[in-house]
Amino acid sequence: MMQLSNDSHCNKHSLLNVMNRFIAAANNMDETIMVPNLLRDVPLEDQESHASVSHNNNNNNEPSFPNKQRDMYEHYLLLKSIKNDMEWGLLKREMAGGASFLEMAVKQEELPQMKGEAVEEGPDLEGQFHYHLHGLFSVLSKLTVQADHLTNRYKREIGGGSLLR
C-alpha cells in the first residue's frame, strides 16, 4: 500500500491545495452572498476589466475566452455548480439526467474512430496527465480569483447599496 507523506498536505503547489483553495473561496462566496437574486442584471463589466488586465499579464500566453455568463448571477451559479461537481463528483449529475463530463469525454474519444481516422496506438499517458494537470491548476487558480472577486464586488456593491432597488 502506498503511503502519502505529510508534506503533500503542506505543499502549496499540490493539486489538493489548489482544489481546497477554490472550494474555500466558493464557500466564502456562498456564505457572503445571502441574496443571490440581487446579482441578477448586474453586468460583469467590472470583472471583465479585471480579467483583461490579468490576461495581459499572463506569462503562459494562454488565449482569453469571453465569458458566457450575461450577469453576475449567472457567474455565481457557474462557480457554485463547479464547486458542487468537485465535491459530489459526476454521479450526481448523471443521476439527474444531464450529460456528464465523463460521457462527453468518451464521445470525444469515439469521434476519430467513427470518422475512420487512425487513433494513436500507444498514447502518451504521462504526457496527457501532465497536460491536463497543468490545465487543472490553471483553471482552478482562475476560478479561485473569480470567486474572490465576485465576493468582494458583492460586499462593495451591497455596502454602497447600489444593487438594492
From Swiss-Prot:
An annotated GO cellular component: cytosol
Alphabetically ordered keywords of this record: Cytoplasm, Cytoskeleton, Microtubule, Nucleus
Domain of life the protein comes from: Eukaryota
Pfam families listed in its UniProt record: Spot_14
Disordered as annotated region, ranges: 46-67
InterPro entries: Lipogen_MT_Stabilize_sf (IPR053719), Spot_14 (IPR009786)
Family statement drawn from the similarity comment of this UniProt entry: Belongs to the SPOT14 family.
Protein name as it appears in the record: Mid1-interacting protein 1-like
Broad class of the protein's primary localization: nucleus
Localization of this protein: Nucleus; Cytoplasm; Cytoplasm, Cytoskeleton
Gene Ontology biological process terms in this record: regulation of cytoskeleton organization; regulation of lipid biosynthetic process; regulation of ribonucleoprotein complex localization
Organism: Danio rerio
Function: Involved in stabilization of microtubules. May play a role in the regulation of lipogenesis.
